[in-house]
From Swiss-Prot:
One of its GO terms (biological process) is protein targeting. The keyword Translocase applies. The gene is secA. This is Protein translocase subunit SecA. GO terms for molecular function: ATP binding; protein-exporting ATPase activity. The lineage of its organism: Bacteria, Bacillati, Mycoplasmatota, Mycoplasmoidales, Metamycoplasmataceae. ATP binds at Q83, G101, E102, G103, K104, T105, D489. Monomer and homodimer. Part of the essential Sec protein translocation apparatus which comprises SecA, SecYEG and auxiliary proteins SecDF. Other proteins may also be involved. Residues 973-983 have a biased composition (Polar residues).
């Protein structure tokens, strides 16, 4: 355990964790002596302390000690010191890297328990529902014992059940369902329909898998189906006529495009003059998808065909991505390629990336066995540091040097020979593959040798945990894709240790060293023996895509047996580092584009939340009328180029669009008497009179006091419709942005400018369309919908504030803010005094109607009148403590002094952590920021915030990597790495 308390080369967070661990260990005997009832009752005591103004960190040591003791009693497992260390790091909002088998699930119990005491909900995110159910059941026993409730959120649950699960103190859920529930919550028409209750604290299991590997994959809710199978079939038919000389594939980026020969063939096939004319953009889009589906994507690698459907395969885990499909027509292109039924193409209704969803949580932490290599990305994107937690027992697994062969055939033959050799002595072996097709090839070769084995890939993942759990038995041969049962321990059968433990055989290097380390980590858990080795060939994708393949293969392609020498190993490591950097750049690009959409999405969702709460829309409708009139008077058939008004067109337009319900004749109010400078104000007053005096009275007659529900429905549905059209357009804009590089402009800048313009149109158009709908609101269907909402028995509670009051509050003056700050400071004075007393080990333990009970030190209790000013109480308590100290022995005084020094050291380390941590990405509070609110509601120019400077443009510009030009740099990296092969 010497390493455990070695402070050298440890982060500030770990140093703080060591200090806190010492204090937690000192509480062991105290809580260990409690009865079950008293131990469980600590939850109520902690909640009272929090209600009285204490912070989580004030009760952290005690809460961790209680959780540790409860875990020991309920699960029969006493958390190791390293598990408590990991839990402390998680509570700090960072990533805890704990090696496989070190007990991450147990380590999560104390931080989850502590944060659940706030009563705001804690979410534990897992990579699949099996792990969510398993951990909720096991850890839930501890939480239930301590008086907390536990819920499991599942995909198939209805809204009411989901709401119940989210209302539990602690909710376990697969990560994708959390994001989809968030999107669905922002599509409801009643606040009571939401299932989530705010995003407080989330602990992510296998955090690297979710926040790194899946960061590029957006969550999408689709709808509005369009069925055009003939277009996909014709594009597929055209692509099948092409030969290799008709297109160009970038092996590194997997990008594909037609060359001049291919363009000529496309023009002839589709009867076009110029394929790339703007009116042919839809054909270009279909051809591009067909090219990618037929020439780049491989069956049983990126996808499989299952039950007549295309099923996506996660490239990092090997799992089927259930319920997922490609968007923007790529799914249909694959269906055409495979001769399957072509499903209707859908449009995007709501979307968010994992990066931006998880950044919405007030506090975020994660645990995994492999994250240190990606620490910079965790810091840059999520403001989370990675802390490597020491193992409970020394790691004794042997990681052998890679075996590199010239060809895939030679590699596979060597793998089978190695499996035969290892299997003869009964040692279990786990073979890790990166692709389904590789696992099936090796399986067939093992069958030919008569070697019984089990295969686990995307086609047989239902029994994942069971198959992986058995991989540690004698004579077991298991083939698994990269999923490798993360989260499931492989327990060695008795006698296997003497055989050398579990043998891990990797058949391909992944696109990240972290993924390789995950595979290795299946062996050598908790000090077990084990061995790992990778068998690689020069024909593997890593060599093909990220080295100068022709030169490397030319030099080593004729080698028989394993290739010797440091250089080839160094080239492999350099290629792996290169693809890690490339993928990081890709994820940053996705995030930069999504951040533009995020700002717009946050504005819309904040606006929806306000619309769901208010009960009087009059002020809101007045503002929309102003916007609508601005739009009407911007039409060039009404305001002519010479700034003259075409009154007849204006009157006809108003009668056609705004008088269907009232049959009001705008030609009889003297519009033609108003010049252009007075017309705007005149029309606003007329429309306000028509709506509030006539139309609203019809609503009140039909719906009584709940007429505002009809207004809410119309305004929300209009906003949603415009937003859904907007994001569908933005998705297509993003996918085509890179095609405009010929204009010598940054694609990101073009995307930002266009997205901003389109958002401004969305804001204006949603206001105008809402006014048109409100002025024509005689639709019985809408009224019946409102009546249905009101009669479903749901209790809907809304604040009494009117829209005007909300807006007045939001745009409060600086003087009011200053006054509020002064008041807040005064209110914090008692908290400050109590903190000072806490440092002296003086704390309030109970508060009655007339008296308060204070504790001095460990045992002295004092009753003081509640009405007594706090500063007077402070003087009395400090004086009594001084008297108590004078009666103490020197040994007791020294102990107290040592404890006070520890507290000071902890505070210093906490301040150090605060100072060294990078600034967290600040999100605009759109509900409380007057500028953001005004921009959305009142249509102020939103573009200024979005446009990037030329300097930012250069920073965001993506660097293209050319394989041929990169050879010298690769050689340099390889030679440097060869000097230190253990890097």
């Amino acid at each position: 355990m010497k390493n455990l308390f070695n402070f050298f080369k440890t982060s500030s967070e770990l140093r703080l964790a060591y200090r806190l661990l010492k204090q937690i260990n000192q509480k062991r005997s105290f809580y260990g002596a409690m009865t079950d009832f008293d131990l469980a009752n600590q939850t109520n005591i902690f909640k009272k302390r929090l209600a009285n103004g204490e912070k989580l960190k004030d009760i952290r040591v005690d809460a961790f000690a209680v959780a540790r003791e409860a875990t020991k009693r309920i699960l029969g497992k006493t958390p190791y010191d390293v598990q408590i260390l990991g839990g402390l790091i998680l509570d700090m909002g960072s990533v805890a890297e704990m090696k496989t088998g070190e007990g991450k699930t147990i380590a999560s119990i104390p931080p989850v328990y502590l944060n659940a005491l706030l009563g705001q909900g804690v979410i534990v995110s897992t990579v699949n529902e099996y792990l969510a159910e398993r951990d909720a059941e096991d850890n839930g026993k501890v939480y239930n014992f301590l008086g907390l409730t536990v819920g499991i959120n599942k995909t198939e649950m209805d809204a009411n059940t989901k709401r119940m699960m989210y209302n539990a103190d602690i909710t376990y859920s697969v990560h994708s369902e959390l994001g989809f529930d968030y999107l669905r919550d922002n599509m409801v028409f009643s606040a009571a329909e939401k299932v989530q209750r705010g995003l407080n604290f989330c602990l992510i299991d296998e955090v690297d898998s979710i926040l790194i590997d899946e960061a590029k994959t957006p969550l999408i809710i689709s709808g509005g189906k369009t069925n055009l199978p003939a277009q996909y079939l014709s594009a597929n038919q055209f692509v099948n006529t092409l030969i290799a000389e008709d297109f160009y594939i970038d092996e590194e980026t997997k990008g594909i495009k037609l060359n001049d020969k291919g363009i000529d063939k496309a023009n002839a096939f589709f009867g076009l003059r110029n394929l790339y004319e703007i009116q042919n953009s839809e054909i270009v889009h279909r051809i591009q998808n067909a090219l990618r589906a037929n020439k780049v994507m491989k069956r049983d690698v990126e996808y499989i065909v299952q039950d007549g459907k295309i099923a996506l395969v996660d490239q990092f885990t090997g799992r089927i991505m259930a319920g997922r499909s490609y968007s923007e027509g790529l799914q249909q292109a694959l269906q055409a390629k495979e001769g399957l039924e072509i499903e209707p193409e859908t449009k995007t209704l709501a979307t968010i990336t994992y990066q931006n969803f998880f950044r919405l949580f007030k506090k975020l932490s994660g645990m995994t066995g492999t994250a240190k290599t990606e620490e910079q990305e965790f810091i840059d994107v999520y403001n989370m540091r990675v802390n490597v937690i020491p193992t409970n027992k020394p790691m004794i697994r042997k990681d052998e040097r890679d075996e590199i062969f010239a060809t895939s055939h030679e590699k596979n033959q060597a793998i089978i020979s190695e499996v035969e050799r290892v299997h003869k002595r009964g040692q279990p072996i786990l073979i890790g593959t990166s692709q389904v097709v590789d696992s099936e090839t090796l399986s067939e070769m093992l069958n030919q040798k008569g070697l019984y084995h089990t295969v686990l890939n995307a086609k047989q993942n239902q029994l994942e945990a069971e198959i992986i759990a058995k991989a540690g038995r004698k004579n077991a041969i298991t083939i698994a894709t990269n999923m490798a049962g993360r989260g499931t321990d492989i327990i060695l059968e008795p006698g296997v240790t003497e055989l050398g433990g579990l043998y891990i055989l990797g058949t391909d290097k992944a696109e990240a060293r972290r993924i390789d380390n995950q595979l290795r980590g299946r062996s050598g858990r908790q000090g077990d023996v084990g061995i790992s080795r990778f068998f690689i060939s020069l024909q593997d994708q890593l060599f093909r895509r990220f080295t100068n393949f022709d030169q490397i293969f030319g030099a080593y392609g004729q080698t028989n047996g394993a290739i010797k020498g440091k250089y080839i190993h160094a080239v492999l490591l350099a290629a792996q580092k290169k693809i890690e950097g490339f993928n990081f750049d890709m994820r940053k690009t996705v995030l930069s584009y999504d951040d533009v959409i995020r700002q717009q999405r946050d504005l819309i969702y904040a606006q929806r939340d306000i619309l769901l709460q208010i009960e009087n829309f009059d002020h809101y409708i007045q503002k929309m009328i102003i916007r609508a009139v601005d739009i009407i008077l911007s039409y060039d058939f009404i305001i002519l180029p010479n700034q003259e008004i075409h009154y007849k067109n204006l009157i006809n337009f108003l009668n056609d669009n705004l008088s269907r319900i009232t049959h009001f004749n705008f030609g009889q109010i003297g519009i033609e008497n108003y010049p252009i400078e007075q017309l705007n104000e005149f029309l606003i007053k007329q429309l306000e009179t028509i709506y509030f005096k006539q139309i609203q009275s019809v609503l009140k007659e039909n719906l009584g006091k709940t007429y505002f529900e009809s207004e809410r429905y119309i305004i929300l549905s209009t906003l949603d419709s415009q937003w859904q059209n907007h994001i569908d357009t933005i998705d297509k804009l993003r996918s085509s942005a890179n095609l405009v590089q010929y204009s010598q402009k940054n694609p990101y800048q073009i995307f930002t400018e266009e997205a901003t313009k389109k958002f401004n149109i969305l804001v204006a158009e949603s206001a105008y369309q809402a006014i048109v709908s409100l002025f024509n609101n005689s639709n019985a269907e809408k009224i019946e919908y409102i009546k249905a909402i009101l009669s479903d028995g749901t209790a809907i509670s809304y604040p009494a504030d009117s829209p005007q009051e909300i807006i007045d509050q939001i745009i409060a003056s600086n003087e009011e803010r200053i006054a509020a700050a002064r008041k807040a400071k005064e209110e914090k004075q008692p908290e400050f005094i109590e903190k000072q007393l806490a440092k002296l080990k003086i704390e309030k333990v109970e508060s009655g109607e007339e008296f308060e009970l204070w504790k001095i030190g460990d045992n002295k209790l004092v009753n003081l009148k509640k009405e007594m000013p706090l500063d007077e109480k402070q003087n009395i308590l400090v004086k009594m403590q001084q008297e108590q100290l004078e009666m103490m022995s020197e040994e007791e005084k020294n102990l107290i002094q040592e404890q006070n020094l520890e507290i000071e050291e902890i505070e210093e380390i906490e301040e150090e952590i605060q100072n060294e941590n990078p600034q967290k990405v600040e999100f605009v509070d759109f509900k409380n920021d007057p500028d953001a609110y005004n921009k959305l509601i009142f249509g102020a120019d939103y573009a200024d915030k979005q446009l990037i400077s030329s300097e930012e443009e250069n920073n965001n510009e993506k660097t293209n990597i050319n394989i041929n030009e990169d050879l010298e740099r690769t050689k340099g990296e390889a030679q440097q790495t060869a000097k230190n092969p253990n890097e």
